[in-house]
Amino acid sequence: MANTNPIVDNKETLQYVIDKGRTTPINVYSAAAVSKGFKGEELTDFTELKNGGALVFTDDGIPLKSEMLVKEAMQKAKELDMPLSFHEENPAYIEQQGINKGVVSDKLNIGGAPACSEYMMVARDCMLALETKATICIQHISSAVSVELVRTAKKLGADVHAESTPQHFSLTE
């Protein structure tokens, strides 16, 4: 993923990662950032990064709040036949990351992250993918509503994929 230090948001850092990878006994492939510095304000140079060896664009771990930036990223990625991968959660609705907003978080008085913080972003990006015809992957999906949104977007013709991890679907209340 692009969430390295430094962030893979330019050709020099990408080349550094690729060169370091060549010194290992395994194949190392790299993602590149969607936005410069993971700030969600300005796109990286997708063409330069693709030509440099990036295989996907993502601001992994950081949600992209700007709908216009996401749409622009999808349009550019579609032009280059490159996938995008999104971390879907709206920070405005999250009181405490890492715990579901529900009975347990309320009992412990620690806030939490409601499912709507995820599925509202999933809905937005699925519909933008449908409109732009971009290929997107929803990272570590965790709510049934999000799964249904992806399923619906796919039925409508969007090129949307999703992944999850055991802790995102098995640790429930």
Pin down the residues of each PLM region.
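A glycine-rich helix N-cap at a beta->alpha junction
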Residues: 19-33
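Acidic (Asp/Glu)-rich catalytic clusters
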Residues: 17-23, 46-51
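Metal-associated gating/positioning segment near the N- to mid-region
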Residues: 1-22
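Histidine/acidic residue-rich metal-binding segments in metalloenzymes
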Residues: 41-173
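Short N-terminal helix-initiation segments at or just after the protein's N-terminus
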Residues: 1, 25, 103-107
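Active-site beta->alpha loop and helix N-cap motifs at the rims of alpha/beta catalytic domains
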Residues: 33-40
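Surface-exposed, flexible loop/turn segments at secondary-structure boundaries
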Residues: 4-6, 36, 92, 144
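Conserved residues at the C-terminal ends of beta-strands
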Residues: 1-2, 34, 60
